[in-house]
Amino acid sequence: MNEKILVVEDEEGLRLFYEEELKSEGYEVITARNGKEAIRQVEEGSPDLIILDIVMPVMDGMEALSRILRKDRKIPIILNSSYTGYREDFMSWAADAYVTKSTDLTGLKNKIQELLKKKKVK
């Protein structure tokens, strides 16, 4: 069975880009436009990994991170933002990784593989 990745991104073009790229790598991909939708997706069926934008309407990524971790600490979460300043925010330390947004998804894909491999070992 393919690992299920939840991509949480408010920018539609970027969300679709991530979805297509990750599907081409063999992952099952579900998406959410904001933190509130992400929490609903987690409640409906735990993804194997979450890629979480930070700056979003309705509920931002930091609030969503906090709420998701209260529900399930086992899901690896990658914070994904254009803003490098959030890397220093102590709340971001609760995530498993922080990857700066880029049109080259090599770093993100490598981090996904690494975290999913770690999850299987546990």
Map each language-model feature to its residues:
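Conserved acidic carboxylate
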Residues: E9
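Charged docking surfaces used in two-component/phosphorelay signaling
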Residues: L16-S24
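Short hydrophobic/Thr-rich beta-strand motif most characteristic of the beta2 strand and flanking loop
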Residues: G26-R33, Q41
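Acidic catalytic/metal-coordinating carboxylates
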Residues: N34-E37, D60-E63
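Active-site residues of response regulator receiver
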Residues: D53
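Receiver (REC) domain active-site loop signature in two-component systems and cognate sites
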Residues: M56
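Alpha4 helix (beta4-alpha4-beta5 surface) of REC/receiver domains from two-component response regulators
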Residues: E63, Y83-N110
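Hydrophobic/aromatic residues positioned on beta-strands within the core alpha/beta folds
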Residues: I78-N80
